Swiss-Prot record:
The keyword Ribosomal protein applies. CDD domains: Ribosomal_L29_HIP. Gene3D superfamilies: 1.10.287.310. One of its GO terms (molecular function) is structural constituent of ribosome. GO terms for biological process: translation. InterPro entries: Ribosomal_uL29 (IPR001854), Ribosomal_uL29_sf (IPR036049). This is Large ribosomal subunit protein uL29. It comes from Borrelia turicatae (strain 91E135). It comes from the Bacteria. Belongs to the universal ribosomal protein uL29 family. The keyword Metal-binding does not apply. The gene is rpmC. GO terms for cellular component: ribonucleoprotein complex; ribosome. Keywords: Ribonucleoprotein, Ribosomal protein.
Length: 66
């Protein structure tokens, strides 16, 4: 999954991060209200968001070039 993220442009990474955050919030809401089919999905989403945050930070500090 990480290789797939690293091939994206900065704008695509930010868009993907936003969509994953929305999906994570929806999943959290479903967990509070009722039953979640795959409870491990929350962990996977949280880790993917962290990976994307790391890549964005690499762009910001200059480790990764645009």
């Amino acid at each position: 999954m990480l290789k797939k993220f690293r091939d994206l442009t900065l704008e695509d990474i930010k868009a993907k991060r936003l969509s994953l955050k929305k999906e994570y919030m929806d999943l959290r809401f479903k967990a509070v209200v009722g039953h979640v089919e795959n409870p491990l999905k929350k962990r996977e989403l949280r880790r993917d968001i962290a990976r994307l945050n790391t890549i964005v930070h690499e762009y910001e500090i200059g480790i990764r070039k645009v």
